[in-house]
C-alpha cells in the first residue's frame, strides 16, 4: 500500500512539473487531483486511497503559506470592504440555495440533501450533519459537494488564465519573501494554532488554525519567511491526491441522474461569481482575478493558493472565502433546521 501511494505521489509531482511549464496556477494541486482521477478511472480499484492525516499535514503547510501573506493593512481592508464581503456572501449563498431548489425539483430528490450538497465550502460540516439527520441522503450530498469542488478547482485556473488573462508570476508554488522570522521557527506556532482550532471545534481547523496563527505572528512581528518550494509543492500534491480520491464511482452510479444538474449548477455558480466579481472589482479597485477567486465557490486553500501563484491579493481572497465558510458553518445549519421544522409544523 505504501509503495502504491509513493508511486502516486511521484506521478503527481511529475504531472505538476509539467503543468508548471504550461504556466498554470496551483500546478501540483492539479497534478495530484488529475493523478488521482486517472488512477480511479483507469484502474477501477477500490482499495486505492490517500490518508486523511497526510492531507491534514499538507493543509497545515498551506495554511502557513496563506497566513504569511497577511500584513497590517489586511484588517483595515476588511473593515473598508465589509459591505462588499456581506453582499458577496449573500449572493453566492442565495444562488446556491436557489439552484438546490431547482435541482431537487428536476431530479426529484430530497430538498435538504440538495441544499447541503450545493452549499459552497462546507463539505466537512455538511457530511457531519448527514450523520445526524436521517432525512439527508449522504450519497447525494457527497457527490454534489465533490463534483462541485472538483469542477471549480479544475476550471477556475483555466478561466483566470484564458478568460480573465491572468499571469502566473514566477514559480507557481513560490511565496513572496517578506523577510522576518524563519519558517522553521514559526511552523510550530502554526501547528499549535491547528491544535487549538481543533479543540474549539473551528471549521476546517487544520487549515484555519495555521492561517490565523501565522497571520497574527506575521502582522505583529512584521512578516515571516515562506516555506521552501519543494515543501509547498509536496503539500499541494497531497491535497490534490486526497481530493481526487473522494470521487467514488459507486456513489456516482447511485446518483447518476443528478450529475448533469450538478455540473450545470456549478457552471451557473461560476458565472454568478464572475458577475459579482466585476461589481467588487469596480467598487474597490482590486483586480478582477482577485475578485473572482474571492467569489469562486471552491475551497479556501485552493482559491488562496491559486491567487498566491498569480501574485493576486491573497488577503482579500482569504477574507471573502473565510467569511463565507464561517457563515455556512455557524448560521446555515440552525437556519435550515428551523426552516424545515417550521415547514413540517
Question: Across the structure, where does each feature detected by a protein language model lie?
Answer:
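Membrane-embedded alpha-helical segments of transport systems
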Residues: 92, 121-125, 142-161, 300, ...
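Small-residue-rich segments of transmembrane alpha-helices in multi-pass membrane proteins
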Residues: 57-69, 91-92, 116-128, 149-155, ...
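Juxtamembrane and boundary regions of transmembrane helices in multi-pass small-molecule transporters
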Residues: 98-109, 152-170, 195, 200, ...
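Structural signature of multi-pass alpha-helical membrane transport proteins
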Residues: 1-53, 64-73, 182-251, 271-278
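Interfacial helix-loop-helix linkers and transmembrane-helix boundary segments
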Residues: 44-58, 70-87, 103-111, 201-204, ...
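Alpha-helical membrane segments and immediately flanking helix-loop junctions
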Residues: 106-147, 286-321
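Structural signature of hydrophobic alpha-helical transmembrane segments
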Residues: 19-34, 54-58, 81-92, 113-118, ...
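Alpha-helical transmembrane segments and their cytosolic membrane-interface
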Residues: 1-7, 138-185
Amino acid at each position: 500500500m505504501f509503495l502504491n501511494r509513493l508511486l502516486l505521489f511521484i506521478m503527481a509531482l511529475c504531472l505538476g512539473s509539467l503543468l508548471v511549464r504550461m504556466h498554470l496556477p496551483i500546478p501540483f494541486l492539479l497534478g495530484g487531483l488529475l493523478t488521482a482521477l486517472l488512477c480511479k478511472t483507469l484502474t477501477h480499484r477500490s482499495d486505492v486511497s490517500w490518508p486523511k492525516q497526510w492531507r491534514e499535514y499538507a493543509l497545515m503547510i498551506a495554511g502557513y503559506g496563506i497566513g504569511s501573506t497577511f500584513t497590517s493593512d489586511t484588517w483595515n481592508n476588511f473593515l473598508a470592504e465589509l459591505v462588499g464581503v456581506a453582499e458577496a456572501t449573500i449572493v453566492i449563498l442565495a444562488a446556491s440555495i436557489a439552484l438546490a431548489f431547482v435541482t431537487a425539483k428536476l431530479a426529484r430528490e430530497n430538498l435538504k440533501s440538495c441544499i447541503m450538497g450545493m452549499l459552497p465550502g462546507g463539505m466537512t460540516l455538511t457530511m457531519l450533519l448527514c450523520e445526524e439527520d436521517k432525512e439527508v441522503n449522504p450519497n447525494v450530498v457527497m457527490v454534489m459537494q465533490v463534483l462541485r469542488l472538483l469542477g471549480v478547482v479544475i476550471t477556475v485556473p483555466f478561466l483566470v488564465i484564458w478568460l480573465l488573462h491572468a499571469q502566473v508570476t514566477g514559480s507557481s508554488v513560490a511565496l513572496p519573501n517578506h523577510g522576518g522570522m524563519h519558517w522553521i521557527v514559526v511552523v510550530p506556532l502554526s501547528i499549535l494554532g491547528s491544535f487549538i482550532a481543533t479543540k474549539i471545534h473551528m471549521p476546517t481547523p487544520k487549515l484555519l488554525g495555521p492561517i490565523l496563527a501565522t497571520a497574527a505572528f506575521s502582522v505583529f512581528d512584521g512578516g515571516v519567511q515562506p516555506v521552501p518550494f519543494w515543501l509547498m509543492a509536496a503539500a499541494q500534491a497531497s491535497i490534490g491526491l486526497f481530493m481526487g480520491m473522494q470521487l467514488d464511482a459507486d456513489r456516482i452510479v447511485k446518483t447518476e441522474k443528478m450529475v448533469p444538474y450538478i455540473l450545470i449548477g456549478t457552471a451557473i455558480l461560476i458565472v454568478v461569481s464572475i458577475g459579482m466579481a466585476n461589481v467588487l472589482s469596480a467598487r474597490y479597485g482590486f483586480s478582477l482575478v482577485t475578485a473572482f477567486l474571492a467569489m469562486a465557490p471552491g475551497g479556501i486553500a485552493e482559491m488562496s493558493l491559486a491567487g498566491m501563484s498569480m501574485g493576486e491579493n491573497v488577503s482579500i481572497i482569504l477574507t471573502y472565502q473565510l467569511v463565507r465558510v464561517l457563515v455556512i458553518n455557524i448560521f446555515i445549519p440552525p437556519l435550515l433546521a428551523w426552516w424545515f421544522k417550521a415547514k413540517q409544523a
